[in-house]
């Protein structure tokens, strides 16, 4: 018989309100409280800006790492709405910043496609930061609201008139939450370069206050990405093959180039998120490549009906490929 324990009654059931749950169990939302989780904060804010870009409302994102350990992300998108929310009777900005599963990404008319943590991202960043300040530029005004560890620290303030449009999120990761709060320039730089390749024409800049700075913008998009990956390799094609199509609201973009290497290098993304474990888009690409090249070889008499068909591994030998899909309602096994 198990030993008798303390009484377990209704008053011992706790309900965590608002972002308290995020602070209590941060790893549930960002994976860890170590280096990876820390940088996930930056990625989440940037993902919001990228979502604006994917939906045609933003072409510039600027990230700055400040000397005090804070980070600011500025975009020239539409700006988070600041008018009063009809249900909650507070500014929409406050709802977005302080409540989980709040945002425009659940409305298909506002965001056709989006990445990130599906509506919890920026509020999680707020909850896991010592302080956060958001400046919004829209509808002829410059607005500001500040927060402390997920709680509203000041009401929405109209700072001035402004012809600008966009959002500036400035936050300081909380030392009470993270094992380290040192943001790494090189790690962020690598991710932002990747995002610039995946979103042709989007300019993403990263800088350190008083230090290094770099800006990425690739009009050639995925084709430039493949050329970058194949730098130093002997290619069998002068330029990468670029494929773009849309089927049933799914945008598919791929760039392919074969080299003399033996290994294949295929990188796949869904809504700008790397799908390292593959998925139906990768299996579809592989089967389509094998089927298409076999059909072409038969039509050109390079293969005869009685010959053995080309194997998938033979077709993909030396291939460098970037496959990027944009899906309205993606289902991720994990990010």
Feature locations, PLM:
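GHKL-type ATPase core
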Residues: 2-11, 69-86, 92, 103-228
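Conserved ATP-binding N-box helix of the HATPase_c
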Residues: 36-60, 121-128
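Short beta-strand/loop element within the Bergerat-fold HATPase_c
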Residues: 60-67
